Amino acid sequence: MSESGIKKLSQERTREWLASQEDEELESIAESSVVDSLDYDYTEEEEDADQNTSEEISTMTLGTQIATKKHSIISDTIRDLMNSINSIQTLGNVNISNSTNVHIGNVTNINGNIQIIADGLTQNRRDRRHVSPPRDNAPKTPTHFEDDYQDESEERVRSDVFIRRQKFKIPKELSAIIPRSSWLAQKPMDEPLPLQLPVKYVVILHTATESSEKRAINVRLIRDMQCFHIESRGWNDIAYNFLVGCDGNIYEGRGWKTVGAHTLGYNRISLGISFIGCFMKELPTADALNMCRNLLARGVEDGHISTDYRLICHCQCNSTESPGRRLYEEIQTWPHFYNIEEEEQ
């Protein structure tokens, strides 16, 4: 067959292919348009403001967001945006030969920020990750996303938009414990010893290091401490069960169920909670103190700490200034504080 005949046959096959496509498939071709959102310009001033408030910043990439129907306007806005940029082109004759990575349809570039701020949400964030299957007798709301499950209070919103940053205001009292994986902890050198629960004693210490109200600095301090405890002290892991930062966060050390290496003579019968910093002349921040009290209450509620536990400080058990004179004075005013000296007398 001649070259002109091959070219003509190729054109005919292309026309047949285009004619055979359903509207749905053509729309999917159009939806492959590129939507690019530039990174949000995050300045040091804004970072400092975030550290001094109760805001948590989370990053969402291309994927799925679950929102309540109260905020269904978010999905409508995204859907309108996608519909406006994904208009279907009218295609004429198409001839493709000796080509790779061919794109048919619009290519739309959006140079700008797309930020969604959802406020007024009262449920736990994990509740929003759950999507209930549709009820048999529940009326089905017609949407463009018929495969998504939804109920009376939630709907799943799909889009091809990159949402770089989304801010939620979360009360510090409800903040979860930051797990070891978040501060890139190395694994224990040996198999950890299990702690017999519930524990009778809780020991308060300080790390005798610098303190900071910035999470990034506290993470660095904790990693340095773990490295020092393992390599210089020869211990199995970081000494403490939990650490409290002046940023108002609780950081997981050895956790609830593992024997620590914080207080000689008390490691097997207590939890060690250490404040990050040195508190000889000043107290930790109010957020740090509140979070420590919340951690104690959570330990009792979850069965890790005895209901009649005894709260003691490191300086009462060993010859040390820890947790610092100023913090020691504060701990003496807390419920469950136990005066070992009176018992010995």
Curated annotation (Swiss-Prot):
Glycans are attached at N52, N95, N98, N106, N318. It is found in: Secreted. SUPFAM superfamilies: N-acetylmuramoyl-L-alanine amidase-like (SSF55846). Changing E231L: Loss of peptidoglycan-induced oligomerization. Loss of DAP-type peptidoglycan muropeptide recognition. SMART domains: Ami_2, PGRP. Residues 1-16 have a biased composition (Basic and acidic residues). Belongs to the N-acetylmuramoyl-L-alanine amidase 2 family. Monomer. Peptidoglycan binding induces oligomerization. This is Peptidoglycan-recognition protein LE.
